[in-house]
């Protein structure tokens, strides 16, 4: 387990977050809401966004994809094209199950450079490992689009790490109109 210092980011201090312990699961989390007692993750808190959007307005898939990619592009990330959903470059998986799978093992091992660094992508994914759970909640899907931003740091060159990652996430959510008190990390 990592120490508290590993998670005490400048961003959390700058933005007035408090480190709290979830009263249900016992895990630690960060929140701006002094009254919050739970981490926000299921099963500690139910899904509340289904049928009740958390942003200022509803977005179509195309609008959300464009907003996300444009957000990161405006902050120095190259927009790259999606990879195939059949992971032909892999011998350990058949389908692209996550955006990072696009870059494994060759980029993540350092064998080849990334197509851009940093980058943003909206990757169609297929997962079949929890078919029995599909439809029970908004959590289990067979196909989805994983919008991601990736940075490939090396010992010689660190582009950014945890603090900037969380800052970007928070800025994206705020720009979409999410209540900052509802956000937990």
Segments and roles (model prediction):
Residues 1-5:
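Basic, low-complexity terminal or inter-domain segments flanking catalytic cores
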Residues 9-17, 28-33:
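Short, flexible, mixed-charge glycine/proline-rich loop motifs
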Residues 6-8, 67:
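Long, compositionally biased low-complexity segments enriched in polar/charged residues
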Residues 22-25, 39:
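Short cysteine-rich clusters marking metal-coordination/redox-active sites
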Residues 19-23, 169:
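Short, solvent-exposed secondary-structure boundary motifs
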